[in-house]
């Protein structure tokens, strides 16, 4: 199997827009036209509720997990695994099936983190939950959890894993630029995890 097939597979799997498809199929809601308009799990949770949004979150995480799992299983080369992970998140962020307008990569990155270091994935999840429950700001929870995960990935698994998660954190930060501005202005949208 050619090395280049792994990142290509990752990109196309990452491009599957579960956070658009699931709300559309189950609730008839186009997430591009409601809430923040973002094709991601947070907007799905905000606009369709915790059940449908939770399904989107799980599927978006799994599409991050599996390409990296495949690359790790059949290659194991850290550089190829990293390239596959980055390609997968870029697929989520810029999906070919949605005219390159996608999400912000958090759920897919979470799946990648669980694949590389499940203890780090658990810490990410708990950090995100605590911050979002306290502040109602999913973007804040995501960014804090990502950078904590980069440090833990380095401590638990070494330089390659820590650096990969850091790169993915930076990519997500760039995708969250408008959210960061709204957080600073006090106008960021809030999300309630337990009700629509």
Curated annotation (Swiss-Prot):
Any one GO molecular-function label of the UniProt entry: acyl-phosphate glycerol-3-phosphate acyltransferase activity
Listed transmembrane segments: 2-22, 51-71, 80-100, 112-132, 137-156
Name of the gene: plsY
Pathway: Lipid metabolism; phospholipid metabolism
Name the record gives this protein: Glycerol-3-phosphate acyltransferase
InterPro entries: G3P_acylTferase_PlsY
Superkingdom of this protein's organism: Bacteria
Bilayer topology term: Multi-pass membrane protein
One CC-aspect GO term: plasma membrane
Organism per entry: Thermotoga petrophila (strain ATCC BAA-488 / DSM 13995 / JCM 10881 / RKU-1)
